[in-house]
Amino acid sequence: MATLHRKLLGLLPRVGVQVLDLGSGAAVVYRRGVRRRVALGKGADLVLRGRTAAWKQVPLGGTGARLLLDEKETAADERTFQLSAASYLCGQHVTALLDRYEVNCVLDVGANSGQYGRQLRRLGYTGRIVSFEPTAEAFAKLRQAAEGDPDWQVHQIGLGREDTTQSIHVGWNTMNSLLPPSDYGKGRYKRFAKTRTEEIEVRRLDGMLDTVLAGIDAPRPYLKMDTQGYDLEVFAGAGERAAEFVGMQSEVATLRLYEGSPRMGEAIAVYEERGFEITGMYPVSREEATGRVVEFDCVMVRATAVPART
């Protein structure tokens, strides 16, 4: 059979069909142009069109993983490449932590339209997700994203230092905030030039936890916050019950986008004082002109909460 296969491949060029033999009984057939094979590793090949394709494989240490790059494209927009890589690596890191720390409930505070919850499911997390999004337009999209997922709860409220009602700035896409923009923020984002407000309900997190964790035996919650400058207020509302979280994630700013928001050092100091330690820092946004990082996703754990390996 193998000999017949080879004979048939050998006949194809006579009728104008080209063959790129990949070995092990595999081949690519094509009519025009040039194809090149780049071996990526055992059982994996990349087939390139043309003679000058710029794809390059970069081994990632001794992990067996390989990064496949179009060097010309990545060099032309290094900033976007770095941010995209950071987003991917952050997702992988968080997923690994959720597994290592046996997390069975993720609180997604500042859920917007459900991007974080969808990512968790895509990366394999199967535990409970509880998402909080106070604005009407985003919440409608969030509720739709969670439909059909019985262990993904959604709440149309904001979280903060006290139970109250507040006005939130809306119309800023994913950057809606309870805080007004800073002068730096106004200069960076044109969207801040126009705003309207919406009245929302705000609750303390410690008053919500019993409801959120109901029905879970031995809860091991993880707190994700992305509230556009308001994360410390959310955290303050956890009170003494912050000690129940085995890990957390907060968007921390090196450059203030919102008036009255904390700088990165201030926020991290508060989290560390409550027993959390950093496991990863991933750039979320960077200035195009200077390369300065504007915001990081800061991932932290309570090291004493790690389960013993069996």
Predicted regions mapped to residue ranges:
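Phosphate/nucleotide-binding beta-alpha loop and adjacent structural elements of enzyme active sites
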Residues: 1-310
